[in-house]
């Protein structure tokens, strides 16, 4: 793809008219929001009319005021309003979240406290710590509607969306985009605030339309953000985990399932792992990123939440004979990430379920992928891996994890990663274009002719083309375990690309691997709380760490109880709040209130309704679930025996054009004796190499390549290569007992663990306070899990 593509830079940050701190003042007739930039070099004024209770009237002063000019202006405002009620300071804030209207007055949502959570290429990233909602019309002109029970209930409902948890923004970096899109996108004037990951897009729609800019608002992403500084062999680097939750078809577990008519899926989350090397000031920053996604199975399927049935039946709706919605979904993935779409489907097999639940979706999913692939050329076909993680996990967490790492290695060979060297401050793009400013953004010709701009160019060496998409039934517990495996393998690749050497990252005793596991567990808990109503189950990670015990088992049991309670009793209010926040439901006087509608009427589009067309779907009392589609079925045995050596580019070698392929079949491996922990000398004697995941056949051990980026041949791991053990492993069949679902996968019977503890015979009335004895017995019954 050419050698070292160049990126035309954005304007230097110091020249951007970015407002970062604001003070709100009020008179009886207007609000005045005064904003300044970070360097306090200029001030701007936004006037908000308080005399109209039905319309939003905003006026932007084009003048850029100095500090002294603003002080004089405020003095005049105080004097001029002495007799009419004064010029009062209301609050300090850090940006407008948006404007919302329920039945009558408009409200303004402000960030009143922020917290710094990290930096990306010199751009500060913040989380919301506190927010405030302020009614715009003066109380003297508000009608009775503004104080009606329905209005107050809508206000309370909106507060269910807790803006102080997991909402993030940046003034100078498009946090809704991956690093590759930020640095590689040179288009101007894109509607950035309308992208799928901007959760306040609806709330800011009117102010952006009126002012034709976005300097007063911030674009919020919802999900997860964590940044950690590390050091390996004296070399310092920073790794960042970002999870971006899509606002399309967003909601709670049983009320948002599957796919909608236009291809949007439930629980759609993009996870980006960024690793950047710490370099002296003034040098370009070597930085890499890998993106993976999760999302509900993109079919029309549903489960009806029930107080009496914690594991409701899965109902598959076959109304879409040509799988058009599913095709829309994967076409969208190609547009976003490139042609190489790899699907890791963790649903259970027929032998893995005593009662067919997930099996129904697994079979239809495979059928769908085959249908889609019929009309596509080889390059564009979906590539699917069917892997019953529940079944393989029963043979040992290490073995299951080893499988997942193999899949991740193959996926990385297909998609590659993004790597560049970027100056601090790159990627801001034209954050704002405001014709009122004295220093308009220069043209590209002007930028190219400026010597100073040369230092703002990013050197791009590798591009990610495609994405790994993972799903289980809920895209929570098992999916997070699999995404950690991909993150761990990717981290080794990223460190190798950055030229950072050290002990093997995939060695789970490596502190770096443990640090990354902590981050993915925390992300998993956060995403599970958002979608499922409880933290994620911890059994898989605990088994991987070797610290699964009775205390952790009981904790997972109560996690299942909390998830069940939230799904049965709280999800309806949460879904209503999300629908109002995102603009999927817009209250109107004279029409039914949201809480008066049937539980799933948010999803349909009726004539004259006040619902958003993007959430339309046929009327059905259940929720539709979305997961991932596959191309064909991967035979694990073929995968681990395959002799394919990837090519790696040097740091200045350009982007590879390697065309890697692997087969897909609907079979399961016969042996799962993977990842046995061995002493180093035993490992070397058994395999002739310290490498995990060798790429060649077991018949040629001496010629195996170093095909795991991030690991040199001198490294000695504590894990036996999966291929070697697979070749000499036993051929006995895998038991299908003790399988578990997403919700309860970590709450298996103690008879299948190394623990000798057993739960006592259920009796008494205080087993689970607040729940019936029958339900308590169900919770503690091994058969239920």
UniProtKB/Swiss-Prot annotation:
It catalyses: a 1,2-diacyl-sn-glycero-3-phospho-(1D-myo-inositol-3,5-bisphosphate) + H2O = a 1,2-diacyl-sn-glycero-3-phospho-(1D-myo-inositol-3-phosphate) + phosphate. Residues 688-707 are annotated as: Disordered. It is a peripheral membrane protein. It is found in: Vacuole membrane. Ubiquitous with a higher level of expression in young seedlings than in other tissues. Its EC number is 3.1.3.-. It holds the Pfam family Syja_N. GO terms for biological process: phosphatidylinositol dephosphorylation. Keywords: Hydrolase, Membrane, Vacuole. A motif (Phosphatase catalytic core) lies at residues 469-480. Residues 158-533 form the SAC domain. It is an enzyme of class 3 (hydrolase). Residues 688-700 have a biased composition (Polar residues). GO terms for molecular function: phosphatidylinositol-3,5-bisphosphate 5-phosphatase activity. Its cofactor is Mg(2+). Its main location: membrane. One of its GO terms (cellular component) is vacuolar membrane. InterPro entries: Fig4-like (IPR043573), SAC_dom (IPR002013). The PI(3,5)P2 regulatory complex regulates both the synthesis and turnover of phosphatidylinositol 3,5-bisphosphate (PtdIns(3,5)P2). Component of the PI(3,5)P2 regulatory complex at least composed of ATG18, SAC/FIG4, FAB1 and VAC14. The phosphatase catalytic core motif (or RXNCXDCLDRTN motif) from the SAC domain is found in metal-independent protein phosphatases and inositol polyphosphate phosphatases. This is Phosphoinositide phosphatase SAC5. It comes from Arabidopsis thaliana. The gene is SAC5.
């Amino acid at each position: 793809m050419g050698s070292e593509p160049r990126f035309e830079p954005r304007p230097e940050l110091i020249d951007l008219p970015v407002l970062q701190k604001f003070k709100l003042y009020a008179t009886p007739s207007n609000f005045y929001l005064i904003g300044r930039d970070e360097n306090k070099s200029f001030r701007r004024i936004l006037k908000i009319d308080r005399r109209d209770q039905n319309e939003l009237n905003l006026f932007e002063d084009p003048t850029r005021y100095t500090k002294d000019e603003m002080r004089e202006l405020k003095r005049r405002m105080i004097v001029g309003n002495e007799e009419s009620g004064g010029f009062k300071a209301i609050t300090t804030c850090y940006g407008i979240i948006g404007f919302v209207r329920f039945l009558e007055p408009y409200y303004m949502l402000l960030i009143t406290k922020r917290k710094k959570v990290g930096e990306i290429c010199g751009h500060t990233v913040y989380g919301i710590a506190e927010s405030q909602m302020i009614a715009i019309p003066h109380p003297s002109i508000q009608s009775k509607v503004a104080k009606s029970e329905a209005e107050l209930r809508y206000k309370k409902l909106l507060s269910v969306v807790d803006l102080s948890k997991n909402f993030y923004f940046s003034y100078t970096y498009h946090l809704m985009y991956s690093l590759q899109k930020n640095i590689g996108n040179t288009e101007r004037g894109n509607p950035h605030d309308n992208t799928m990951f901007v959760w306040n897009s609806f709330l800011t729609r009117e102010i952006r339309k009126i002012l034709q800019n976005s300097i007063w608002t911030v674009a919020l992403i919802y999900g997860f953000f964590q940044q950690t500084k590390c050091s390996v062999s004296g070399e310092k680097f920073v790794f960042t985990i970002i999870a971006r939750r899509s606002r399309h078809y967003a909601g709670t577990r049983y009320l948002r399932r599957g796919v909608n008519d236009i291809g949007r899926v439930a629980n759609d989350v993009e996870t980006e792992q960024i690793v950047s090397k710490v370099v002296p000031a003034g040098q370009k920053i070597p930085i890499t990123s890998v993106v993976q996604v999760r999302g509900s199975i993109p079919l029309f399927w549903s489960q009806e939440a029930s107080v009496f049935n914690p594991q409701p039946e899965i109902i598959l709706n076959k109304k879409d004979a040509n799988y058009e919605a599913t095709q829309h979904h994967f076409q969208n993935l190609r547009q976003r990430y490139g042609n190489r779409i790899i699907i890791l489907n963790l649903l259970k097999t027929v032998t893995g379920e005593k009662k067919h639940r997930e099996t129904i979706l697994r079979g239809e999913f495979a059928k769908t992928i085959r249908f889609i692939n019929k009309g596509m050329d080889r390059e564009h076909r979906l590539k699917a891996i069917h892997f019953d993680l529940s079944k393989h996990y029963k043979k040992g967490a290490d073995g299951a994890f080893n499988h997942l790492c193999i899949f991740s290695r193959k996926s990385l060979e297909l998609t590659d990663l993004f790597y560049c060297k970027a100056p601090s401050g790159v990627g801001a793009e034209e954050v704002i274009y405001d014709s009122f400013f004295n220093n308009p953004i220069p043209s590209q010709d002007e930028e190219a002719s400026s010597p100073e701009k040369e230092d703002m160019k990013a050197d791009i060496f590798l591009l990610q083309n495609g994405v790994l998409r993972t799903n289980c039934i809920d895209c929570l517990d098992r999916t997070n375990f699999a995404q950690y495996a991909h993150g761990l393998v990717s981290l080794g690749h990223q460190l190798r690309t950055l030229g950072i050497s050290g002990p093997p990252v995939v060695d789970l005793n490596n502190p770096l691997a443990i640090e990354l596991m902590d981050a993915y567990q925390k992300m998993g808990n956060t995403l599970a709380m958002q979608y499922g109503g409880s933290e994620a189950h911890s059994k898989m990670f605990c088994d991987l760490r070797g610290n699964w015990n009775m205390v952790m088992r009981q904790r997972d049991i109560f996690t299942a109880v909390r998830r069940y309670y939230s799904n049965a009793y709280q999800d309806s209010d949460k879904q209503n709040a999300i629908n109002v926040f995102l603009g999927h439901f817009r209250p109107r006087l004279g029409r039914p209130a949201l809480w008066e509608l049937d539980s799933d009427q948010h999803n349909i589009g009726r004539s004259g309704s006040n619902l958003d067309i993007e959430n339309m779907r046929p009327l059905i009392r259940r929720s539709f679930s979305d997961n991932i589609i596959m191309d064909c079925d991967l035979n694990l045995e073929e995968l681990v025996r395959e002799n394919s050596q990837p090519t790696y580019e040097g740091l200045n070698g350009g982007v590879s054009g390697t065309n890697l392929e692997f087969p897909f079949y609907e079979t399961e491996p016969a042996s799962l004796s993977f990842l046995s922990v061995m002493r180093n000398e035993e490992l070397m004697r058994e395999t002739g190499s310290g490498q995990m995941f060798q790429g060649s056949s077991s018949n040629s051990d001496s010629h195996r390549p170093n095909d795991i980026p991030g690991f040199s041949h001198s490294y000695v791991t504590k894990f036996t290569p999966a291929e070697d053990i697979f070749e000499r492993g036993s051929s006995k069949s895998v038991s299908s007992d003790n399988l578990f679902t997403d919700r309860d996968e970590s709450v298996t019977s103690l008879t299948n663990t190394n623990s000798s503890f057993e739960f006592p015979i259920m009796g008494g009335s205080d087993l689970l306070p607040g729940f019936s004895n029958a339900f308590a017995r169900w919770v503690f019954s091994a058969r239920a899990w």
